[in-house]
Design a protein with these regions (language model features):
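Nucleotide 5′-phosphate-binding alpha/beta core
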Residues: 1-95, 101-123
């Protein structure tokens, strides 16, 4: 059997859950207080770094839909309040086609672009 990332893809279930929580806490730390869109969303749901202690707790986080993101972009053009870093940290910009309404604009950092590439690697392996 071929693997794109053998260590990750063969990790025991308990280790996967621990990694998921570790990654969530890292993401939360980077977003909360920096990204106005998600800070307001977490505050409204009373979610903080202590709320999520295991993967089951993630269900408490409110989902985000495209309409919310487009509304944020209309209120604060062109990218809305869903930016975590200064504009200079972003290396790419793309947008959806807008076939279901208005196009959604998305900024990528070099790290997020690399993540998308890794997703492709998992799919193609």
């Amino acid at each position: 059997m071929k693997f794109f990332d053998h260590a990750l893809e063969t990790m025991p279930p308990k280790a996967i859950k621990e990694l998921q929580i570790e990654k969530f806490h890292s993401l939360f730390k980077n977003i909360y207080g920096q990204n106005r869109f998600y800070t307001e969303k977490f505050d409204a749901a009373r979610i903080d770094h202590k709320t999520i202690q295991n993967v089951n707790d993630i269900a408490q986080i409110p989902l985000t839909n495209k309409e919310e993101l487009i509304k944020a972009q209309e209120e604060k053009p062109p990218f809305g309040s869903n930016a975590t870093f200064p504009e200079s940290a972003y290396s790419r910009f793309h947008q959806t086609s807008g076939t279901t309404g208005k196009p959604l604009r998305v900024l990528d950092t070099p790290e997020s672009w690399e993540w998308w590439g890794r997703c492709g690697g998992f799919v193609l392996t």
